[in-house]
Amino acid sequence: MTEQPGRPKYYRGAVAISGDRIALVSDSPQRIERYERERGEGLQVADGAGRLVMPGLINLHNHVSMTLMRGYADDLPLMPWLTEKIWPFEAKLDGDDIYSGAELGIAEMLLGGTTAFVDMYWYADRVAEAAIRSGIRAVVSPAFVGTAFDGYVERTQRMIERYNGAAGDRIRVWVAPHAPYTCTPEQIRESLKLCERNGVGVNIHVAETLSEVETIRERYGKTPVEHLRDLGVFDYRALAVHCVHLTETDMEILSRQGVSVVYNPQSNMKLASGIAPVA
């Protein structure tokens, strides 16, 4: 089954794979038989009768290594969850822990039909290594908060040079300021120089909770979306994650600037953040 506009939808047929590429998609018995003859005895055939072949799913927002924290720190709103539980937990993790958590989370995604994901986390190079080993496609985004910005630009530049386009272009590297309430305007602007220099995108949490919206209004006299627009975040390919609490003006800004909004209903319910205004 294909769902792309202008492409045919095959309801009965075959998919042929050569190496790591799709070599044939057809519902023509003649084309399928010809392909089988050309490949000869080396062709392996899997009977997919009663099954569905479709494009892989894409998970647009992850902290994949947090799979290690499943079942931990339930029944808390976002800020107590972060400050009292998650950040202290993360402070005890090292790169090997992040790699192990990424391997587990990636394996679970692949089992569920997800073949590509976007990640934002610490030790992003280890997430990239786990993605390369697994065969999945990934956009890995080294994250920063304001208290841990020293050296970020230099480290991320090195990571872009090493991993952006790696593994046959399966891996991309983007920039990830954590959120407008945890990063200063100066830090966000500085991180955006990486986007300008390398042609990469930016991945950031936006308007996740009412308290965030109130904090940004108090600090800057704007909504989080207006604040990030004025900093130039949306001048690059941008993923705005959550966007639970938006004004009509916010929505117009995001639409006009071509920002991709990523809705996270399970996260927003778990942390009592609210319900995004999805039409």
Show the residue positions of the predicted features.
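Active-site gating loops and adjacent loop-to-helix segments of metal-dependent hydrolytic enzymes
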Residues: L68-S100, A107, S134-P142, L210-R237, ...
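Histidine-rich, glycine-flanked metal-binding segment
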Residues: T2-M54
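Active-site-adjacent C-terminal substructures of enzyme catalytic domains
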Residues: V233-A279
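Divalent metal-coordination and catalytic microenvironments
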Residues: V15, D20, G50, H61, ...
